[in-house]
Amino acid sequence: MLRVSNLSKFYEIKKHWYLKSKKYFIFENINFSLKQNENLMIEGKSGAGKSTLARILCFLENPSGGEVWYKGDNLHQLDKKRQRLLRKEIQYCFQDQKMALNPYKKIKNLIQDGLENFNFKKNGDLIDEFFDFFNLKKQILEQKPYELSGGEATRVGLIRSLILNPSLLILDEIVSTLDIKNSKEILNFLYHYQQKNFISYIFITHQSELFYNFKYEKIKL
């Protein structure tokens, strides 16, 4: 499904105007593949490029070299229209959902906007199903992100991604800001969701001990 070949990211920086620019690599020649319904864990120290790699995989940033192939398409050679169509298949859940969600909109509108952006019809029944699955109270739909707890905001972020029925969900330090109880609950939800749906996860984390329910391959940056 996904194949990453010799992927590199660097920035060219000049320390002084009279010096030649020098390449500073975030990562270099990364290779891995991921089959449908399998998982991958990406580990590495802070600043190793984990989030940069995630952003490249979902078109938010371009690589400096190498290729990303998804279901036979070289992603960064596609035009913007085709990339946009694929965004519903490759979803990215940011680390801090309270910061990622638009603070001026109600949760109901944030979820419905996501559906409309990809030409899905508004579906209150489907939203209710996801709220039941993630054990969220329906009154949250009328609240705004700043009114939610960290665990509630993370669940809402996951619903916004999963309601599009993606094939691949990239989870960037999804439980790093949560307590152990909320972390285990959310990972348990994700585990059971995968048992019922044909989805692959890429976990970016430094807390691998919490992911004991999942089978996954691992790479380290």
Indicate where each model-derived feature is located.
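ABC ATPase NBD coupling module
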Residues: 19-20, 75-91, 117
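Q-loop/switch helix immediately C-terminal to the Walker
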Residues: 96, 103-119
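Conserved ABC ATPase signature
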Residues: 144-148, 152
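Helix-to-loop junction immediately C-terminal to a conserved catalytic motif
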Residues: 58
